[in-house]
Amino acid sequence: MSNNLRRVFLKPAEENSGNASRCVSGCMYQVVQTIGSDGKNLLQLLPIPKSSGNLIPLVQSSVMSDALKGNTGKPVQVTFQTQISSSSTSASVQLPIFQPASSSNYFLTRTVDTSEKGRVTSVGTGNFSSSVSKVQSHGVKIDGLTMQTFAVPPSTQKDSSFIVVNTQSLPVTVKSPVLPSGHHLQIPAHAEVKSVPASSLPPSVQQKILATATTSTSGMVEASQMPTVIYVSPVNTVKNVVTKNFQNIYPKPVTEIAKPVILNTTQIPKNVATETQLKGGQHSQAAPVKWIFQDNLQPFTPSLVPVKSSNNVASKILKTFVDRKNLGDNTINMPPLSTIDPSGTRSKNMPIKDNALVMFNGKVYLLAKKGTDVLPSQIDQQNSVSPDTPVRKDTLQTVSSSPVTEISREVVNIVLAKSKSSQMETKSLSNTQLASMANLRAEKNKVEKPSPSTTNPHMNQSSNYLKQSKTLFTNPIFPVGFSTGHNAPRKVTAVIYARKGSVLQSIEKISSSVDATTVTSQQCVFRDQEPKIHNEMASTSDKGAQGRNDKKDSQGRSNKALHLKSDAEFKKIFGLTKDLRVCLTRIPDHLTSGEGFDSFSSLVKSGTYKETEFMVKEGERKQQNFDKKRKAKTNKKMDHIKKRKTENAYNAIINGEANVTGSQLLSSILPTSDVSQHNILTSHSKTRQEKRTEMEYYTHEKQEKGTLNSNAAYEQSHFFNKNYTEDIFPVTPPELEETIRDEKIRRLKQVLREKEAALEEMRKKMHQK
């Protein structure tokens, strides 16, 4: 053993202050095998500074002989992230590293003092498939000190192993028979938390739960009184997310290092595993909320599964279980949950569709679906987080009669760190949840609103069953972000941290003094008054577009009803008793000159008359400009079409024209000449000088449209007629409006055909040139 023991040279990184305590924090050390002057093998730790994410060794490794290269292991990088509270703390860190002859593993032993009992050390490697099953770890308590020893095999691939020693309580994920490696359970924010009788569960689950309940000393289960259990569904299976510490050390893709190391816990003493002490309040902001489960050695021993919790009610219940187990108290102060009548018809059989957690008697059971294989669709669904999707508050899972396979394991050790961030709050919703929400909305209309005095839990069972999904996300009674406290550290089995700034709490803030039934009635009224919010929550992009179309249709119907009402008032004023239908005749093209406009403008008000006269003069000036300037390039045409259409739509929206449909149809069908004139006609808010400038701008842009001179006067006539009818009839009768729309469509089609023919002639001329 003495021959194999190797000395370690710990060279601190050179820093400006010269303080040795700073080199321990945030430095990288590379283990290099060298040969000493006496011929013995040495392990030398070389400091590696971090510059812009790249690892650069300060000291080059010495050259080894070819005879020793065969037994050389891969380099191991040791990272220390130590938070030194005071300057009096010893800066020296002893890392005795030795290698026995029968093994190629490096054993790193470190002494942890009493002030760092909350330290959790995680061991990671770049290649999990080759060396992960060989990693071994055990801890021994000696007089308040904890000795942590790791056996890290060198990686068989080119990537190097690394060890992360972190003071911020990174959880160590232990292998579980229920879930494969690198996965944990996720309780989503929209999970359903309810209290159901044990008789509603499948028979196999009842046998397991009742068997543990009768053997426990907390209370005997009588035959006449069926106990109630807490049912949490759905529970998803997701992959572990890499923490920020790993990202800082290795700037690799997340997929390469996202899985935690699986530790073989057969050598861990039971008292050490079950009594992990956490320093209160010092939890990493980046560490996920996980349940750490111990590996089961026998078929009926409890197993440990990592779990994330995003549900406030579930966190409250788990915290209550932990407090009861720590204090030795059998009473549980449960949050207000709606219960199901044990004598109800629905409670006889409650088939389970999704994975669920059942909490009873201080123990947590996992109910898995039959034939679930890590559920890859759920994993992809959890990874595709859409921040724009709001969290739905009233998910009622539609249950079916699919058989379930009961996998129940007792929880032995739960260590929870603080939640990572609120990015896991918003989850993409599955199709079954969308359908179930529609069913809930349909059934909710049938439920009578309960009176505030009705507080009997044994009331109508069907209404209670509907209401239980609405009391899921009430504001919890306990303060947000509670911790165990710095001054009074104690042995805890689990600590739950509620999310700060949760979206759920900002939407529903209900006093804790209100009982469950009153809360349910309030929430029922609140949700019935906001169907639009549910529509936006449950709809996809297609449904959103359909909702906008429905909104436009409803606005159109309301406008039409308003027109009918005002039409009836006009008929009363003028003494009309019959419906009149106005027939419009088309004005010939040769009459649509400037003089023809003056005869029509005499009927218009003074403001409109000035505007019309100005438009006529500008139209004549435009014709002259067309005659003078015909030889512009035609490739400018496509560059400005989109810009003009956008300006046209914007002007129509700003000015609030009565005939929005006509202007939109115009901007989509007419070429640029009509669009520019329509812009000038509809911009009533602009001054005369601005209109003149805009007219000249469009005139210079469309010099290539000289062949359309014959249509210019006709188009001005068309637009004048439109403006004329809008000014004289502010509220157009429905029949007249339909006639005008049909006439406009016919004219637009004709203009389109004429201009297409003109463009074709221009193309032929250019081709001939």
Swiss-Prot record:
Entry-linked InterPro entries: LRIF1
Cross-link (Glycyl lysine isopeptide (Lys-Gly) (interchain with G-Cter in SUMO2)): K259, K279, K446, K605, K702
Renumbered residue ranges of the record's region Disordered: 378-400, 528-562
GO MF assignments: nuclear retinoic acid receptor binding
GO cellular component labels: Barr body; centriolar satellite; nuclear matrix; nucleoplasm
Key word Endoplasmic reticulum present: no
Tissue distribution of the protein: Widely expressed, with the highest expression levels in heart, liver and placenta.
Subcellular location: Chromosome; Nucleus matrix
Modification sites for Phosphothreonine: T732
Keywords for the protein's UniProt record, in alphabetical order: Chromosome, Coiled coil, Isopeptide bond, Nucleus, Phosphoprotein, Repressor, Transcription, Transcription regulation, Ubl conjugation
Modification Phosphoserine occurs at: S402, S430, S436, S502, S599
Short sequence motif PxVxL motif: positions: 580-584
Predominant location: nucleus
UniProt motif (Nuclear localization signal) ranges: 628-631, 642-645
GO biological process, one term: regulation of DNA-templated transcription
Compositionally biased region (Polar residues): 378-387
Recorded coiled-coil stretches: 740-769
Disease in which the protein is involved: Facioscapulohumeral muscular dystrophy 3, digenic: A form of facioscapulohumeral muscular dystrophy, a degenerative muscle disease characterized by slowly progressive weakness of the muscles of the face, upper-arm, and shoulder girdle. FSHD3 is a digenic form characterized by adult onset of proximal muscle weakness affecting the face, neck, scapular muscles, and upper and lower limbs. Muscle involvement is usually asymmetric, and other muscle groups may become involved with progression of the disease.
Subunit structure of this chain's protein: Interacts with RARA. Interacts with SMCHD1; leading to recruitment to inactivated chromosome X in females. Interacts (via PxVxL motif) with HP1 (CBX1/HP1-beta, CBX3/HP1-gamma and CBX5/HP1-alpha).
Function: Together with SMCHD1, involved in chromosome X inactivation in females by promoting the compaction of heterochromatin. Also able to repress the ligand-induced transcriptional activity of retinoic acid receptor alpha (RARA), possibly through direct recruitment of histone deacetylases. Also required for silencing of the DUX4 locus in somatic cells.
Entry text on domains: The Pro-Xaa-Val-Xaa-Leu (PxVxL) motif mediates interaction with HP1 (CBX1/HP1-beta, CBX3/HP1-gamma and CBX5/HP1-alpha).
UniProt record similarity statement: Belongs to the LRIF1 family.
Protein name per Swiss-Prot or TrEMBL: Ligand-dependent nuclear receptor-interacting factor 1
Protein's organism: Homo sapiens
Lineage per the UniProt record: Eukaryota, Metazoa, Chordata, Craniata, Vertebrata
